[in-house]
Amino acid sequence: MRVLASAPAKIILFGEHSVVYGKPAIAAAIDLRTYVKAEFNENGRIRIEAKDIRTPGLTVSFSEDQIYFETDYGKAAEVLSYVREAINLVMEEAEKQKGVTVSITSQIPVGAGLGSSAAVAVATIGAVSRLFGLELTPEEVAKLGHKVELLVQGASSGIDPTVSAIGGFLYYQKGSFESLPVVELPIVVGYTGSSGSTKELVAKVRKNYEEMPEIIDPILNSMGRLVEKAREVILAEYDKEIKFKRLGTLMNINHGLLDALGVSTKSLSDLVYASREAGALGAKITGAGGGGCMYALAPEKQSEVATAIKIAGGMPIVTKISREGLRIEDIVQ
């Protein structure tokens, strides 16, 4: 038996950093996917093949605590811990231990802040659980994905695996999630080609908050109110043009507030301003900042904005919101 599953990447639409201080955030799944094929093998080991994950690939197998590297190339190795923990958790759920081979291909750049780790964990859980005969709901997959992140990272809000498992728009605050109606946003993601350390950037904001609470607290409060306004706009019965304009304005304000927190970089700002000049209604950082990605809302201007991002030194990815989260693509008996 062979199962092929896929799970999407995500962007933080509004509310990164302020979410750490109990404010809400809105995230969305986007139409870039990681694909995981799972099948049983005869040697009793877990074997992982990652041949195309937007970095050079690797093949590795392990048994108990021993890892057998057949190739090892850079950041591709980061998928190992997420995949292994995902498989182990599914085996615990199924109360079975068998040799499994998983093959991974992905459209999601690793280390870009687009939730590549969560997507590979969710797709692995989806494929391997079906292989073992489990029928998990998207919510159950999301919970297992959150467990994987806790095991590997030590801390996780659960936003990334929840968005990847369920898809669409997700409103998050203090551990609770609410699905929002999907607005078909024509977006362009711009990748700087570098990534900042989320841990270091969060610590930087925390330091400024502790040293100057009277300055930083109003910024965080404004970001929280901005997310509530964005939720209002998403839920409102506006026509598409008005909705896009209002969301674009909120994106621009949110970027300015993130810049005030000190988490932007020149390369990110170059992509943001190039996008706006090319006709985007809004453009902002998505994720922790310090590198990674921005995104632009560009109705009828995606091609022009993508070109502007490329000229400004970024890697443009023209995409859209994914209504679907985890998807079982194929089952071969």
From Swiss-Prot:
Specify the pathway.
Isoprenoid biosynthesis; isopentenyl diphosphate biosynthesis via mevalonate pathway; isopentenyl diphosphate from (R)-mevalonate: step 1/3
A single GO CC term, please?
Answer: cytosol
Major site of localization recorded for this protein: cytoplasm
Show the InterPro entries listed in the entry. GHMP_kinase_C_dom, GHMP_kinase_C_sf, GHMP_kinase_N_dom, GHMP_knse_ATP-bd_CS, Mev_gal_kin, Mevalonate_kinase_arc, Ribosomal_Su5_D2-typ_SF, Ribsml_uS5_D2-typ_fold_subgr
Residues annotated as binding ATP = 109-119
Listed HAMAP family:
Mevalonate_kinase
Give the protein's recorded name.
Mevalonate kinase
Q: Which gene encodes it?
A: mvk
